[in-house]
Amino acid sequence: MYKVIVVEDETMVRRGIILTIDWAALDCVIAGEAANGEEGAELAVRLSPDII
């Protein structure tokens, strides 16, 4: 499975991306989410995702 991090500053949009897409059907798992680029960069270093 591919590890995905969702980075989006708008909470409703970020939650919508996470909840409306069938990630399992795409062979993906949500490894984390971030509210801004700085948090996203920290998660990327820590989690080594395949997709951001």
Regions found by a protein language model. Give the residues of each.
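Non-catalytic signal-transmission and effector/linker regions of two-component phosphorelay proteins
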Residues: 1-3
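Short hydrophobic transmembrane-like helices used for membrane targeting/insertion
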Residues: 5, 51-52
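Conserved acidic carboxylate
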Residues: 8
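Two-component/phosphorelay signaling modules centered on CheY-like receiver
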Residues: 11-32
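Acidic, metal-coordinating helix/loop segments flanking the phosphotransfer/catalytic sites
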Residues: 18, 33-51
